[in-house]
């Protein structure tokens, strides 16, 4: 064999030996797609390149958002340890999600702690300190959030504007705000969404457990709500989207709250509320209304004068039972002339409190 042939074979051999084995290439790729972040800026800047994200005890600087809206489609995001936030008066949000096919979860013992007492002043969003919204699940599609543990939000906890999302086994605990000025600490605020499925949530707060302002194909089941304003649809009206359709709220408890079941629409606005079901709702310690449906809200408060621009139709109330405080009203219905229809009620059994003599235009199938 000629010497140049020997040199050629040697060169080929060196190239072969230098190439990593396929298993090593795969391992390198796997490592590159798994990212652990310990700062908000790192996470926001690099999350798009990771398929498996761990957020480890992140301290988010004051006035900044833990921005996860560039998450890669199909990625998994896991919170570890305590996620905390610096103090500043601003509108937030403190956390923002975005993306498709996401799985968001938490490691054992993890918590997202808003330390809301720094902002609480009994005024919520109605004045006083400017308080940041907590979590935006916006522009999210076909995703699952599970086991999310949230504590002490400054004001509203979770804003949802999404398509086909499952929110499973959330804990939102703002009970420290009961005696420390927590206000407007809604659990779930849903708008402009299609397909939001909430199951197994525990919400302790000082406002609506859930409030559906617009959207369709929404369910809330197996929930435990206490301390707040109950299970609400609305206020509906005065927004870009003013339709609420195909909502089921079922198999849930509401305790030590202002209201049990509530639907409210805005006076002289237009829109539509239809295909609403409340089923198997157990109430206790209700202070204001067991069931309240009214078409008279203006500037955040009832006026006593209903309007007809937002019909409330095809409402099923089945198995709303429980106890009210002495000063509470069992059922209050205030509809415009002909703007509430096709209601079906059964198994409504409320004790305590009093009946109302101020109901108006109660549709057949319901009683006040």
From Swiss-Prot:
What is the reaction catalyzed?
A: (1,4-alpha-D-galacturonosyl)n+m + H2O = (1,4-alpha-D-galacturonosyl)n + (1,4-alpha-D-galacturonosyl)m
Asked whether the keyword Oxidoreductase is assigned, the reply is no
S-S bridge residues: 35-50, 209-225, 335-340, 359-368
Proregion residues are 19-31
The Enzyme Commission number assigned here is: 3.2.1.15
What is the active site of this protein? 207 (proton donor), 229
Pfam families the record matches: Glyco_hydro_28
Q: Which UniProt keywords apply?
A: Cell wall biogenesis/degradation, Cleavage on pair of basic residues, Disulfide bond, Glycoprotein, Glycosidase, Hydrolase, Repeat, Secreted, Signal, Zymogen
Q: Which GO terms describe its molecular function?
A: polygalacturonase activity
Question: What PROSITE patterns does the database record attribute to this sequence?
Answer: POLYGALACTURONASE
> What main location does UniProt list?
secreted
Q: Which family does it belong to?
A: Belongs to the glycosyl hydrolase 28 family.
The protein's name is Endopolygalacturonase I
Q: Which gene encodes it?
A: pgaI
